[in-house]
């Protein structure tokens, strides 16, 4: 059995764009003319390891949606958490600021984001980066990981296909432990605020936050109603929160 599907563009890294097209298994170019054997779990619903997943924001669908084509996107993941779960408000990026993260194939994404801790950047990024960086325990496909891989030239290796398996077996890839630590600093609850070791701990902590719960319900209301809430909607919001707690 082939563990990995064939991809039409071998020169590309595996990103969200590759989810849009995977070469069909029955094409002659795939060399799969015999009976296919699948190793998907037969028990449904599948129970994910509790040390790897904790709710919707650790689901591969959300993680892939908030990824770049070829890498994670901790900044926009952090913005999502800050605005929708902590009811935070961010200003626009100043027009004279270069918002691009430096490119360096010899460094992990988190290492490349270190310049954002400079004083002129950190006054805003301190609100979002510590909330987005815990998701580094997953790759841009939402797969759980504990290490980053580097090739013999010291460049980060993003592919996860048959070639990856071969290089790993031959000992041609080195590893560097993932740093998924972060911090909750604006929940309004001292019991929730503080350092977190990864996204699972962060989600469990936010799950106990009154502010996160009420902010989530408020944004859910806006999504379904297509407008902001008004004073006259207070009863609806109170009932929505009661239903949330009861379930």
Stretches with model-predicted labels:
Residues 1-224, 234-246:
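Active-site substrate-binding loop specific to GH73 endo-beta-N-acetylglucosaminidase modules
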């Amino acid at each position: 059995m082939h563990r990995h599907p064939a991809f039409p563009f071998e020169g590309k890294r595996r990103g969200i764009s590759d989810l849009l097209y995977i070469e069909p298994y029955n094409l002659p170019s795939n060399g799969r003319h015999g009976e296919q054997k699948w190793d998907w779990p037969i028990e449904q619903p599948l129970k994910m390891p509790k040390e790897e997943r904790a709710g919707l924001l650790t689901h591969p669908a959300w993680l892939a949606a908030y990824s770049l084509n070829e890498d994670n996107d901790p900044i926009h993941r952090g913005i999502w958490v800050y605005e929708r779960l902590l009811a935070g408000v961010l200003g626009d990026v100043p027009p004279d600021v270069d918002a691009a993260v430096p490119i360096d194939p010899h460094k992990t994404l988190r290492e490349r984001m270190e310049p954002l801790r400079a004083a002129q950047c950190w006054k805003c990024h301190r609100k979002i980066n510590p909330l987005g960086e815990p998701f580094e325990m997953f790759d841009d496909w939402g797969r759980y990981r504990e290490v980053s891989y580097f090739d013999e030239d010291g460049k980060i290796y993003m592919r996860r296909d048959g070639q990856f398996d071969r290089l790993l077996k031959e000992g041609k890839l080195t590893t560097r432990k993932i740093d998924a630590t972060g911090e909750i600093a604006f929940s309004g609850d001292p019991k929730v605020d503080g350092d977190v070791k990864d996204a699972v701990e962060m989600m469990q902590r936010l799950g106990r936050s009154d502010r996160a719960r009420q902010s989530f319900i408020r944004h859910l209301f806006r999504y379904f109603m297509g407008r902001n809430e008004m004073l006259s909607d207070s009863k609806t919001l109170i009932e929505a929160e009661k239903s949330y707690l009861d379930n």
